[in-house]
């Protein structure tokens, strides 16, 4: 079983995982064109209806797509059917950790490949100056959504930090000892 299949399955069956992981997963991370198409359908449904999709809704939406090859359509329908087959439960913490590592790995891989194309002159949109930005964006992929302090929930840690006695290095000047 591939991690990509587990991620796609959890996106349609596990609401907590979907809410936490979907903002960080991009369709470019899926190498297989069928998995990429299935993810696009799942993502479109979730963004439009803010609810987990059903098997029927995904297949109908896929059927309404125009310009899709027959092989891609058949493969996508087969993959969607497999997503809804009963499976054993997956540990949530393990799943989040593995998904974060997978996203980081894919982001770095994609940025390195794009950097090689830029360096070789195959990219018309970007010049070589964009390579550091691509790589830094890829290295910044993280599921940690905490920014700064939460003044209500972190009050104990903040109180301890403010009242912690620090080891001080004594100065020869008494005035410097008072202000530090």
What are these regions (language model features)?
Residues 1-102:
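Noncatalytic partner-interaction/assembly domains of nucleic-acid and motor enzyme complexes
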Residues 85-151:
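Interdomain "pre-motor" coupling segment immediately N-terminal to P-loop NTPase/helicase cores
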Residues 13-19, 34-36, 87-92, 107-109, ...:
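Short amphipathic alpha-helical segments, especially helix-boundary/capping motifs
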Residues 19-24, 54-58, 75, 94, ...:
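Short coil/turn segments at secondary-structure boundaries
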Residues 9, 141-180:
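The Walker A/P-loop phosphate-binding site
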């Amino acid at each position: 079983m591939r991690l990509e299949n587990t991620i796609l399955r959890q996106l349609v069956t596990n609401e907590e995982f979907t809410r936490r992981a979907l903002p960080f997963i991009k369709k470019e991370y899926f190498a297989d064109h069928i998995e990429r198409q299935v993810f696009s359908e799942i993502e479109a449904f979730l963004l439009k209806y803010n609810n987990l999709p059903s098997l029927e809704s995904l297949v109908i939406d896929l059927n309404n797509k125009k310009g899709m090859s027959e092989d891609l359509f058949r493969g996508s329908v087969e993959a969607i059917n497999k997503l809804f087959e009963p499976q054993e439960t997956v540990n949530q913490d393990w799943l989040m950790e593995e998904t974060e590592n997978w996203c980081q790995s894919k982001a770095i891989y994609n940025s390195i490949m794009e950097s090689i194309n830029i360096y070789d002159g195959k990219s018309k949109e970007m010049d070589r100056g964009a390579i550091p930005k691509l790589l830094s964006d890829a290295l910044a992929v993280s599921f940690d959504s905490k920014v700064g302090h939460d003044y209500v929930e972190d009050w104990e840690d903040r109180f301890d930090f403010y009242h912690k006695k620090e080891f001080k290095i004594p100065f020869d000047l008494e005035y410097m000892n008072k202000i530090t």
